[in-house]
């Protein structure tokens, strides 16, 4: 899993460097339109120095126009790691020929071998096929047309909307069952599965946003709006049902996101994520602590909610508490005690109304 996370992180960094709207991407697109082809290496360490033969050491500030003009020469361009300077133009690259390559064209074969030998980012711009290919280490990625990415991103947003609706239905039903004191592990796992799918699609959309650069602003806004409060509520759901009382609910949610990136999760995986044995029966009753529902009561800060749960242990305990008992909790006076009682009643009524709408 760690290796996969590192690959994803590397890919995000690469895509941000060559995303639309960046000077480097503007220069690359100019070369692509001119159909001259090009080979660009980012980074000039000892390993790169050992395979560079000839070329002109120009060490000038990067500009898209400079890249376009210098790419007309047959050799490769060597830039610094951030792409802010052009160090060498018209360089011949001589990587180890024994390194395996799946490419057929000389430019792309050289690019792949250089990337594998040096772990530097290498950009190969095809002369005839209008394709930009990125190489770094064993990573190989072909940049897609912006129109294609936008279409895929919009399709993913529509899919996310559907799973958000599944989450809304599941969390509403769970809330009703919590007030009725009839929650089983099955209902909790069902809601966590919807969280898993939402996080999976979110990760896909985020990768599109990185690749779209400045063209992805609208997609980013839609994603932010769709996920508003969902992840925070999912973290509180975990805090409610984790076997041992925990303050690491955000870390557990992050673990769920990491798992969602790599595999489809079974019911037993989600049960274990909550700290229970994987073979636990899904029909077994579980009791919420009440953090999620209590967070919906207006003007009750997290510290007061913590005091409330510490005193009454469960949501049922809070619901059954009298005004006097609530008043005894640190930070809760008579006025706030009444607001808590009224708030819980309103939340319950709202949940029942939502189910029947």
Swiss-Prot record:
GO molecular function, one term: ATP binding
Chain's role: Participates in a DNA-damage check-point that is active prior to asymmetric division when DNA is damaged. DisA forms globular foci that rapidly scan along the chromosomes during sporulation, searching for lesions. When a lesion is present, DisA pauses at the lesion site. This triggers a cellular response that culminates in a temporary block in sporulation initiation. Also has diadenylate cyclase activity, catalyzing the condensation of 2 ATP molecules into cyclic di-AMP (c-di-AMP). c-di-AMP acts as a signaling molecule that couples DNA integrity with progression of sporulation. The rise in c-di-AMP level generated by DisA while scanning the chromosome, operates as a positive signal that advances sporulation; upon encountering a lesion, the DisA focus arrests at the damaged site and halts c-di-AMP synthesis.
Membership in a protein family: Belongs to the DisA family.
EC numbers for this chain: 2.7.7.85
Keyword rRNA-binding among UniProt keywords: no
Alphabetical list of Gene3D superfamilies matching this protein: 5' to 3' exonuclease, C-terminal subdomain, DNA integrity scanning linker region, DNA integrity scanning protein, DisA, N-terminal domain
Cofactor: Mg(2+)
Gene Ontology biological-process entries: DNA repair
Sorted UniProt keywords: ATP-binding, DNA damage, DNA repair, DNA-binding, Magnesium, Nucleotide-binding, Nucleotidyltransferase, Transferase
Gene: disA
HAMAP family assigned: DisA
Reactions this protein catalyses: 2 ATP = 3',3'-c-di-AMP + 2 diphosphate
Self-association and partners: Homooctamer.
Domain DAC: 8-146
Coiled coil: none
UniProt-recorded name of the protein: DNA integrity scanning protein DisA
Binding, ATP: 75, 93, 106-110
Oxidoreductase listed as a keyword: no
Domain of life: Bacteria
């Amino acid at each position: 899993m760690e290796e996969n996370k590192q690959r994803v992180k590397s890919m995000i960094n690469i895509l941000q460097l060559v995303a639309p709207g960046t000077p480097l991407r503007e220069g690359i697109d100019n070369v692509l339109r001119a159909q001259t082809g090009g080979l660009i290496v980012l980074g000039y360490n000892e390993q790169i120095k050992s395979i560079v033969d000839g070329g002109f050491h120009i060490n000038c500030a990067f500009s898209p126009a400079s890249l376009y003009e210098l790419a007309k020469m047959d050799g490769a361009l060597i830039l610094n790691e951030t792409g802010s300077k052009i160090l060498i133009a018209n360089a011949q690259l001589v990587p180890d020929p024994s390194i395996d390559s799946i490419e057929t064209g000389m430019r792309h074969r050289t690019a792949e071998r250089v990337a594998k030998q040096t772990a530097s980012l290498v950009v190969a711009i095809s002369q005839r096929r209008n394709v930009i290919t990125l190489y770094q280490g064993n990573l190989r990625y072909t940049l897609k047309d912006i129109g294609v990415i936008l279409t895929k991103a919009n399709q993913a947003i529509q899919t996310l909307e559907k799973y958000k609706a599944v989450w809304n239905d599941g969390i509403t039903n769970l809330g009703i069952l919590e007030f009725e004191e009839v929650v089983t592990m099955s209902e909790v796992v069902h809601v966590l599965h919807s969280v898993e799918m939402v996080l999976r699609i979110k990760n896909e959309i985020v990768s599109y946003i990185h690749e779209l650069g400045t063209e992805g602003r609208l997609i980013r806004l839609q994603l932010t709006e769709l996920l508003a409060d969902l992840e925070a509520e999912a973290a509180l759901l975990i805090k409610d049902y984790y076997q041992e009382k925990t303050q690491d609910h955000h870390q557990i949610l992050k673990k769920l996101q990491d798992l969602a990136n790599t595999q489809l999760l079974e019911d037993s995986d989600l049960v274990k994520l909550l700290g229970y044995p994987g073979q636990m029966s899904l029909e077994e009753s579980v009791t919420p602590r009440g953090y999620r529902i209590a967070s919906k009561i207006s003007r009750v800060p997290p510290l007061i909610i913590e005091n409330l749960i510490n005193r009454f242990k469960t949501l049922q305990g809070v619901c059954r508490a009298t005004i006097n008992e609530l008043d005894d909790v640190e930070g809760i006076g008579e006025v706030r005690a009444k607001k808590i009682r009224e708030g819980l009643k309103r939340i319950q009524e709202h949940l029942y109304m939502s189910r029947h709408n």
